[in-house]
């Protein structure tokens, strides 16, 4: 094998399968492996081009005659929470987010298992075992972090570590932002809007770290599962001509070239 072939990623195309988001459609994906010394740089490059990471795989939809999946990233420094978002932040003011290395725990898996059983019992991840979960967290060749959201333990002071685990986010750190790979939460906490809260927290984290964007994955117009991503404005959506800006009023325009 030549040096060129080792350093050049090989891309593969999956066979058609039923689309999990739009009824009656078929999906295909193009994917490559994220391994080796250049995995971080490759992940950055591919994420900018609309790919997502799952373990050591980077993938992007490559469906015949369908372009419904649109990569979305929130412009962190310009984002201002709406009244409803501020209410979500207030409801979760008793939580503290603790960032740590991507190491799986039985405590995390317990929440993960409950979340799948209640929210996604018929989904593709429904049968994941504790070993599968460990692979999802640990099988990364890029900079990945776990953020655990716990009840604030006020008895030990305002700066104390949290108590009971409520929610978890698996997050990649990119050169220009945070990419939310997967997040889950205690499904019994029905009034907190924890999925929304974790996105808002990531936007705040990106801003504090001086990172421009929070990557949310794919927005799919007409899919109830994915429509929530359109609420975080201003944002950018990836089109054939590049990233397009969607402002607070929902108007779309090309971003100025740097």
UniProtKB/Swiss-Prot annotation:
Q: Which reaction equation describes what this protein catalyses?
A: N-terminal L-glutamyl-[protein] + L-leucyl-tRNA(Leu) = N-terminal L-leucyl-L-glutamyl-[protein] + tRNA(Leu) + H(+); N-terminal L-aspartyl-[protein] + L-leucyl-tRNA(Leu) = N-terminal L-leucyl-L-aspartyl-[protein] + tRNA(Leu) + H(+)
User: Which organism is this protein's natural source?
Assistant: Bradyrhizobium sp. (strain BTAi1 / ATCC BAA-1182)
The UniProt similarity line reads: Belongs to the R-transferase family. Bpt subfamily.
Q: Per the UniProt record, which residue ranges are transmembrane?
A: none
Q: Which GO terms describe its molecular function?
A: arginyl-tRNA--protein transferase activity; leucyl-tRNA--protein transferase activity
Protein name per its UniProtKB record: Aspartate/glutamate leucyltransferase
One Pfam match, given by its short name, reads: ATE_C
* InterPro entries on file: Acyl_CoA_acyltransferase, Asp_Glu_LeuTrfase, N-end_Aminoacyl_Trfase, N-end_Aminoacyl_Trfase_C, N-end_Aminoacyl_Trfase_N
Q: What highest taxon heads this organism's lineage?
A: Bacteria
* Recorded GO CC terms: cytoplasm
Keyword set for this entry? Acyltransferase, Cytoplasm, Transferase
Kindly list any coiled-coil regions of this protein.
Answer: none
